[in-house]
Amino acid sequence: TGYENLNNYPTPILFPGTITENLINYYSNKNNFKLGVIQPTSDQIEKEEIKWKKREIKAEVHATSPYTNINNNREWETISKSLKSFDPDLIYLNCMGMKSEHKSFIQKKLNKTVLLATHVTGSVINDLL
């Protein structure tokens, strides 16, 4: 649901990763669903692959920094080519530092649905207010 251990906090806390992961689980209700993931650092790739494998979702996970100019960072171009070959049903930008420009870049390259962690979390917060 996005709430974690509510008994431990005097005020409910929303966890962006949990919110987005539950949304992806719901969205992935078809056979052979494939997920593309972009993380901010390579040391997170293995953990992310394991997480989706446990959920029986085939995922291709990449890493690149959202804090560089997307037009001058060849990694974004390389990742988009790899994801195009993988042909995911959905792409998840799993970093609160990734922005609309990253989402637009990937959408234009792949013509696929892209979930941006900040947008998903913001939508939930907006609906709760």
Tell me what each language-model feature is.
Residues 1-129:
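Non-catalytic structural scaffold of enzyme domains
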